[in-house]
């Protein structure tokens, strides 16, 4: 009888402890895919970051069109069976097509993104557009955690709606400016790629480290990820000057060839050689996550504004509350 009672008490105690643990368990707000994450993100499928518990796929609500755009920015589910190599010419063609699509407004996310999906034709009856996976080989002209104040990264600035306007490097995109020529001086001949913070590998968080800057000046990179149309901006003019954004009182937008981006990034590779003609072999490429070891670096230093971090960040999103 005493043994039975002891067993019963043990079962009840386990149930109470289990219930308590479940009640205190953190709940993910960001929904990844029903399948493993793509390409180099695959090992991190079950390794969410702090932001994944704080901010969902659509970020901070502004309107329905912005929600759709934010969800597309955070799309980690695009099919990778077919990866299309692209060049600046491809981005120019995409830009021309979207500029001439009547359903796409200037400087604002479109209400429907359907026309973006197969917006240009490729040889052999194929098409290309938003949601397809592409790869681009070029040079990093600039890399930085965007929407992060350089002097007061955890308290100043507005963040970005796609990341619930959270403040700090851990909660924002890494904005990469890419060119086909490492000596390119005109930003209107560049494109943009973005590393999102959701499920971001720790090594990628240091992509904008000053320790890599010298290497990037001379070595090509290969960026693979989803093709995405950022309707919140305007591209450079045909004359190669910054465009004026009608949705922002005709203020000058930042310079880039097209509104089409590689966003989010699924894989980053670096060429071991500073001569691009030697980068044609698969053996010439190294996953970025292995660059630290390959360069013989014992440590990699974050950029100055990214040295401080916090688990309970501030947000400029109206009504945003940290989970209990």
Predicted regions and their residues:
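Bacterial N-terminal signal peptides
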Residues: 7-16
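Hydrophobic alpha-helical segments
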Residues: 16-18, 277
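OB-fold and OB-like single-stranded nucleic-acid-recognition modules
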Residues: 26-324
